[in-house]
Amino acid sequence: MNEERLQWRTNPAIIAQYFTGEDLPKDIDIHLKPNEACVVIEDGKITGIATAQRLTVNPKLGTLSRILSKREPFRSFLFVHTGPHEVLVKLDGRWSDGTEGKGAAGLKIRFNNDDLGRLLSFAADGKTSITLGDIASSMELEISQKFRSAHMGTTHPSSAKEDRDTATLLESGLRSISQTALTDIGAQLDRVWLSWIPSDHERVMGMRSELEVLAEHGRLIAARDNEMM
């Protein structure tokens, strides 16, 4: 494998990719875009976060170290596209009048370089390719439950859909709830939007499914390319 053929991000659905040192050739040069970073882990501990446009990863053990019989550390690498990204979250619950409400929320987020290590929780659970769908799934339940309890149950549907002041209050509430959930994965929230059009709720799920299919397609292509190198 050479630097020109190594593409850690195979499609827009993937926002982070985890590799062990065994997955990569020794002393490989990798180019990072301005909004990409690489978390370097040695023997289970983060030793650095690289943001340079070009870096060499997975270095060979030096001659002196080999002579002294030093053990090569177990290395792994987490590449991250820091954003911005738009995460789609479905919302559902009951309004103050008892009617059912379904909507969609869009969260424009970006990842903080200093907190990228928090994404390693996905790798610990066996997810080596982290997608926007994974990010949404990790916090959707928390956001939906808290928003339903704190805001939907005390709001009339007509006000949510037609009154600008009410809509602003709901967006503010969503922002507060979402930022708490995003902190757990090392991200910050730039802006939010809300829609109570029923079709948008279904569109969120459809778009997410399409992105996951693209992500899986990209993983298969990457695996095939790696086998050929």
Regions from the language model: what does each represent?
Residues M1, I14, I30, M139, ...:
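Detector for methionine-enriched segments
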Residues M1-A50:
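N-terminal, positively charged regions that mediate nucleic acid binding
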Residues N2, N11, N35, N58, ...:
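Detector for Asparagine
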